[in-house]
Amino acid sequence: MTHPLFRHAEFYTTVNRLQDLPQTAGVEVAFAGRSNAGKSSAINTLVGRERFAFVSKTPGRTQHINFFQLGEERFMVDLPGYGYAQVPLAIRQHWGHLLSSYLQTRQSLYGMILIMDIRHPLTKLDLQMLDWFRQTKKPVHVLLTKADKLSKSRALVALNEVRQFLTVNYPHCTVQTFSSLKVAGVEEASQLLQNWFDTGHASVQQENGEISEQKKTPAKGD
């Protein structure tokens, strides 16, 4: 059963340049991952719609930053998949600039869901994404997708190895297994996202309240 968070999910906008990013006052959670790691499938599974985010057998198909609205001032942000060598160098460089700039400077971004294929986790580019995001001190949650491709015992070993690595090197990260095929790990991921959006939304409201109070307070000497 789809989590209530995603009940009214809908496409919002797509951009390919930083200057075109929407001027939202809400909370954003980014979904990032290596091409063909199962990012679009994970989004579709969470939302409960097969073609909500386009799934392609061709890696690197997501070429823009796609915004999906989950309700008032809450957005899932689907970032371009990285690491597909067949994409021309100029486009890969553009994506790199787009991704790093968005992740490091977007004020409304609360956290990142990082998608990794459980059979090939912690690639060089995955670590680069973690390094880009580390300086923001914002939370990261790793979904080890395609867990159905491994036996339960091997999946557990992979999970523990990744968790141990992240605990030592990226303590702001959490991790879980996930399978779109078996619809496994959906409840855990959905609840985490709900908590992130709730916490982020409360922070935004508090900041807006403080700004309003500052405007109401007369300057000394008035």
UniProtKB/Swiss-Prot annotation:
GO terms for molecular function: GTP binding; metal ion binding. Pfam families: MMR_HSR1 (PF01926). InterPro entries: G_ENGB_dom, GTP-bd, GTP-bd_ribosome_bio_YsxC, P-loop_NTPase. The keyword Cell wall biogenesis/degradation does not apply. GTP binds at residues 33-40, 60-64, 78-81, 145-148, 178-180. Mg(2+) binds at residues 40, 62. GO terms for biological process: division septum assembly. Its cofactor is Mg(2+). One of its GO terms (cellular component) is cytosol. Residues 25-199 form the EngB-type G domain. It comes from the Bacteria. Keywords: Cell cycle, Cell division, GTP-binding, Magnesium, Metal-binding, Nucleotide-binding, Septation. PROSITE patterns: G_ENGB. The keyword ATP-binding does not apply. Belongs to the TRAFAC class TrmE-Era-EngA-EngB-Septin-like GTPase superfamily. EngB GTPase family. Necessary for normal cell division and for the maintenance of normal septation. PANTHER family: ENGB-TYPE G DOMAIN-CONTAINING PROTEIN, MSS1/TRME-RELATED GTP-BINDING PROTEIN. HAMAP family: GTPase_EngB. This is Probable GTP-binding protein EngB. It comes from Nitrosomonas europaea (strain ATCC 19718 / CIP 103999 / KCTC 2705 / NBRC 14298).
